[in-house]
Regions:
Chain B
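C-terminal motif of bacterial Sec signal peptides marking the signal peptidase cleavage site
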Residues: 23-27
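Hinge/cleft segment of the Venus flytrap/periplasmic-binding protein
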Residues: 29, 37-54, 203-204, 290-339
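Extracytoplasmic "Venus flytrap"
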Residues: 43-81, 85, 90-102, 119-122, ...
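An alpha-beta-alpha
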Residues: 58-60, 65, 78, 167-212, ...
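Structural motif
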Residues: 88-111, 210-232, 246-248
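Hydrophobic alpha-helical segments within soluble ligand-binding/sensing domains
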Residues: 100, 156-181, 220-222, 267-271, ...
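Hydrophobic alpha-helical
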Residues: 117-133, 200, 214-273
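Flexible loop/hinge segments that line or gate small-molecule binding clefts
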Residues: 123-164, 268-276, 280-281, 329-331
């Protein structure tokens, strides 16, 4: 022990390790939200409600995984919300217009979202502009393109139904099916979420690439000096966001058959909220993937809990904002305490 | 230089107090404000329930964005009917399809006794309404989605067919001899708005143009409309598609300084004032209050007596054409938020 700090030394090592975890704040918040709604909302504890809450959390969580990785890497993606809609629109229109098996649309959509992610990363590396500006640009462009292209091709603002096309059923099975386990209805998005969560956590904590993510987010210049390919790391992180958007976009398409072109915008901030509640620092270099899952879960519990509790949903956004502030404060506090202790 | 400290005389504080009272008294507005609103609320009939049925629970899930005056009126109607019918009324809304679907699912989880849903997103609601049906919850669709309603197993639909409403507006404009109409769409990509404009175009029998403005940025919308009016002096009629947009349209017409008539869909305080003063020619109303009120009331009738208005055929709440003749009566109802 190099720093003599009586306060910290007094604590057992296990507790100290726990306090240093980025997820701690969100774990406390998640438990608190759960307890509140379990007490005030009778339907909240029903198994069927749990399925609804998990589903709501998964539709945020699928994107919160790559978005939190990106934030640990020190960057934003404001286009993350509309890319989801782009993914769904691309898949639907490609399949419909070419009368192709729906898998063709699904694959074209994957290529498209990865290309958008690559574009964001490439622009960032090339121009050295802040990612806030670069992705704000792609966000606006995609919002316009979603509407413009859809209208030009289908004549209306939503896509035509592809429910009767070949391959729809198998795609639906992959992206939008549901299984009932002991009364609990689990949608496909929940499996995708858990899968992405496991992969994201493993990459971040157990691989060299994970170390690179922390390095480029903590101090890009220092990382470059020790040989970390900074631009390439960030581009891969943007590709990850593209992949997440593809998964969620396919889910939207195959569970609802048609896609509205104007949707998705605004959700990028929800993903960032989930990541921040989960302990990601907005300046990068610190955070966790598991925390983003807790953030998404808090979001799912809060958004549906308010309905189950029969509260006035007009206040939902207020509640969410207060949660965000509290989580950020708690994280800052915990981090300060942890940094005071020995490393 | 010496500074003299302000030393209040003995009379200072009493004078202050008298002044404060005087200002407070004189400062009371004899018109408008909260007091007037409370008086109106009292005047609007409320009262307890008039029935002896058990306390049923009815949920309404709409595609409305937050803080929309139109949906507030729908809600008021539903709450009024709920009070009368001894019903617990639950309201929730989300403009995004997947979130609205989740809200409907949450209502089903709560085991509500009846469900009112808007189908602005059509196909997307098929699955979840199937679940409502499987759970034995009676569903009535309101406002939008008439074409899907029966297909998804709803008991009936209460709303206005937007194409019909557009045609009614077109006919009225033709009757009024309007020559060149500018239809202002304020939500790019809203199917209902497109239908209103194209319906009006089909019956207007005049020059007809459509322009798109950004409805969530009113100064921008106003500037866009007045720029259009200035650049094309042959336009003699502006057709807006909502109450708030009509107010913006009126400002734009004033900017343009020309004898342009504004006609609109839906109502609002400014629209009624405009009808009264003559700056608004007519308004096509779909009676949002009725959509909420009838929705709840029809659920009650169905559960109480298995009744269904129109035998399950869509029930129209509009188009109702309102002109200067109705303005006086409407003013009061708009002010209390039920029109």
């Amino acid at each position: 022990m190099s720093t003599p700090d009586l306060l910290v030394q007094d604590r057992p090592a296990a507790l100290r390790r726990l306090l240093a975890r980025p997820e701690l704040g969100s774990l406390i918040a998640a438990v608190a939200v759960f307890v509140v709604f379990a007490v005030v909302a009778e339907p909240f504890l029903r198994v069927s409600s749990l399925g609804t809450v998990l589903y709501a959390a998964s539709t945020i969580g699928i994107m919160a995984v790559p978005v939190s990785l990106l934030m640990i890497g020190g960057e934003f993606d404001l286009s993350a919300g509309v890319v989801v809609t782009t993914a769904a629109l691309t898949s639907s229109m490609v399949s419909y217009q070419f009368t192709a098996v729906t898998w063709v649309g699904v694959l074209v959509s994957l290529v498209t979202t990865l290309a958008i992610g690559w574009f964001n990363g490439w622009m960032l590396g090339r121009t050295k502009l802040p990612s806030f500006i670069v992705t704000l640009g792609t966000f606006l462009m995609l919002t316009g393109a979603n509407l413009g292209v859809t209208k030009a091709i289908s004549g209306t603002v939503s896509t035509k139904s592809i429910a009767d096309m070949q391959g729809f059923e198998s795609c639906r099975w992959l992206f939008a099916s549901e299984v009932t386990i002991g009364g609990l209805t689990v949608k496909a998005t929940v499996w995708w979420w858990l899968g992405l969560l496991a992969i994201g956590s493993w990459v971040l904590l157990r691989t060299r690439f994970g170390n690179w993510i922390f390095a480029v987010g903590g101090d890009a210049d220092a990382a470059r000096a020790v040989g970390v390919p900074v631009a390439r790391t960030k581009t891969v992180l943007y590709l990850g966001v593209g992949f997440g958007a593809w998964v969620l976009g396919q889910h939207l398409l195959f569970s609802f058959d048609t896609v509205q072109s104007g949707e998705g915008s605004g959700n990028e901030l929800i993903y960032i909220v989930a990541a921040v509640i989960g302990g990601c620092l907005i300046t990068g270099g610190y955070g966790s993937v598991a925390g983003s899952a807790l953030g998404a879960l808090i979001f799912g519990m809060a958004s549906k809990g308010i309905i189950y509790a029969q509260w006035n949903p007009d206040w939902f956004k207020f509640f969410l904002g207060a949660m965000l502030l509290l989580a950020a404060l708690l994280n800052a506090y915990v981090k300060r305490r942890a940094e005071r202790g020995p490393r | 230089m010496s500074t003299t400290r302000f030393r209040p005389s003995r009379r200072f504080w009493p004078v202050c107090a008298v002044l404060a009272i005087a200002v407070t008294a004189a400062g009371c507005s004899s018109t408008g404000g909260r007091r007037a609103e409370e008086a109106r609320a009292k005047a609007a009939a409320t009262g307890g329930s008039a029935v002896t049925t058990p306390r049923w629970k009815v949920a309404m899930v709409t595609h409305a964005g937050a803080g929309d005056a139109f949906w507030d009126t729908v809600r008021k109607g539903a709450e009024q009917a709920a009070a009368k019918d001894n019903i617990t009324f639950l309201y929730s809304n989300d403009a995004q399809t997947q979130n609205q679907v989740q809200l409907v699912q949450a209502a089903i989880d709560q085991k509500v006794d009846g469900l009112l849903v808007t189908l602005a997103k059509g196909d997307a609601m098929a699955d979840v309404l199937g679940k409502a049906k499987a759970a034995g919850i009676p569903v009535i669709t309101i406002n939008s989605g008439e074409e899907y309603s029966a297909k998804f197993g709803a008991l009936t639909h209460i709303g206005q067919d937007e194409t019909t409403a557009g045609q009614a507006a077109g006919q009225e404009m033709a009757a009024r001899g309007r020559k060149n109409v500018l239809c202002v769409i304020h939500e790019q990509g809203n199917v209902g708005q497109e239908q209103r404009c194209s319906g009006a175009q089909s019956r207007a029998g005049a020059g007809f143009q459509v322009m798109y403005v950004n409805g969530v940025n009113m100064p921008d919308a106003r500037a866009a409309i007045s720029a259009k009016l200035q650049s094309d002096p042959s336009i003699d009629t502006v057709l807006t598609l909502s109450g708030p947009m009509a107010a913006t349209g009126l400002q734009a017409v004033q900017d343009a300084h020309s004898g342009i008539e504004l006609d609109t869909f839906d109502l609002g305080p400014q629209v009624v004032a405009g009808l009264k003063s003559g700056s608004v020619g007519f308004a096509v109303d779909q009676q949002p209050y009725l959509q909420g009120y009838q929705g709840v009331d029809l659920i009650w009738l169905y559960k109480y007596n298995l009744n269904m208005l129109g035998g399950g055929k869509p029930v129209s709440t509009g188009p109702q054409i309102l002109t200067k003749d109705n303005a006086d009566a409407l003013a009061e109802y708009v002010a209390r938020g039920t029109r």
